[in-house]
Amino acid sequence: MNYFILILPILPYLYGPAVCSEDETRLVKTLFTGYNKVVRPVSHFKDPVVVTVGLQLIQLISVDEVNQIVTSNVRLKQQWKDVHLQWNPDDYGGIRKIRIPSTDLWKPDLVLYNNADGDFAIVHETKVLLEHTGMITWTPPAIFKSYCEIVVLHFPFDLQNCSMKLGTWTYDGNLVIINPDSDRPDLSNFMESGEWVMKDYRSWKHWVYYACCPDTPYLDITYHFLLLRLPLYFIVNVIIPCMLFSFLTGLVFYLPTDSGEKMTLSISVLLSLTVFLLVIVELIPSTSSAVPLIGKYMLFTMIFVIASIIITVIVINTHHRSPSTHIMPAWVRKIFIDTIPNMMFFSTMKRPSQERQEKRLFPADFDISDISGKPMPASVTYHSPITKNPDVRSAIEGVKYIADTMKSDEESNNAAEEWKFVAMVLDHILLCVFMAVCIIGTLGVFAGRLIELSML
């Protein structure tokens, strides 16, 4: 008797689960005896099955710009009422809910219409939650690979409008009615992506009529997602390096031509840019539908560098010109020696036209007395007796020859200095022009799109 008193409190724990399991076994056996999972769960054939659909987006796995495929991890919640699966909880030990395999009952054949790669229907058959009222809730997980028309025109500052179109495959709107549980998909458990941010999301229900059966509607629910790309990765790894290459290209014109390193720097920048483009080409969507912004900027940078090389060749050629090969036109002297230097910051520098007057070999008042060191009588001329001396005459002619030769060399040097001065003026002009083009070109490519995004 004492042992019975001790065991009595734990009897419910020993026999309770067995009783509950027996009730649930009896309930399942009763429900599925004669149950046909092929037949729609309605009392009359003309009655439609109302299915409430809810999409819960868990993760945006990837966006394939080339193949235009968006891979996402979702949970597709479906609720409907099965009139053949109802019971009185009091008859089965108070059981109000049971979980049964989804393969054992009728389910709406929802599929992803815009499936791009993978299974159209849900593959993972999880259990459903069945209530005593006949209400069924099924929330299977799925990996959807949906088609999305990717517009790469503004890449990497692009905004994509992708969608998932869900509907029954064999039932029309008279047999199965699908309704969204909300005007927005559920993002309560959404895991943020490192590349995309969800700007907006909506769900829409559509009635579609086909030519074969104009009186029969076919229903679908389309979920739209507005995805904004996070461009930081491309700004740091692509755009900023291209800007630095453009800046180095402008510095070519700051380098003195006499250093002989202008072409070396230009070619080095071009080779570096080429190698850089080969490395990052895989980061850019390889599609011919449109040229993306980043592609336009890379093309601009390449043209910018090549143009600097061509112009550098012209500047170096100008720097090394001589009067024996090129005679400076009057308009070149007027523009690049007399006019532009007065308008720019190096206008105080001495120009060849000024230095020519200061570097005369002989002053204007030079006479023969400078040779002998003694004053020559005013009456002495080239035909006077003192100049008839062969030695004196020979000395005078030698001095005149030397003076003429040095004067010719001086004029030649002055002409060469003028060409060098013109090349220096060109360098200063091109330095300002290329730096301005670098800034304006960068703003011209990206500013418009950035302003549009800031207004969203």
From Swiss-Prot:
Task: State which residue ranges cross the membrane.
Answer: 231-255, 263-281, 297-316, 429-447
Gene Ontology BP annotations: acetylcholine receptor signaling pathway; chondrocyte intercalation involved in growth plate cartilage morphogenesis; membrane depolarization; membrane repolarization; monoatomic ion transmembrane transport; motor neuron axon guidance; neuromuscular synaptic transmission; receptor clustering
Q: Which residues lie on this side of the membrane: Cytoplasmic?
A: 317-428
Which reaction(s) are listed as its catalytic activity?
K(+)(in) = K(+)(out); Na(+)(in) = Na(+)(out)
InterPro entries in the record: Neur_chan_lig-bd, Neur_chan_lig-bd_sf, Neur_channel, Neuro-gated_channel_TM_sf, Neuro_actylchol_rec, Neurotrans-gated_channel_TM, Neurotransmitter_ion_chnl_CS, Nicotinic_acetylcholine_rcpt
- What are the boundaries of the signal sequence? 1-20
* Name the UniProt record assigns to this protein: Acetylcholine receptor subunit alpha
Q: What is the lineage of its organism?
A: Eukaryota, Metazoa, Chordata, Craniata, Vertebrata
Point out the gene that encodes the protein.
chrna1
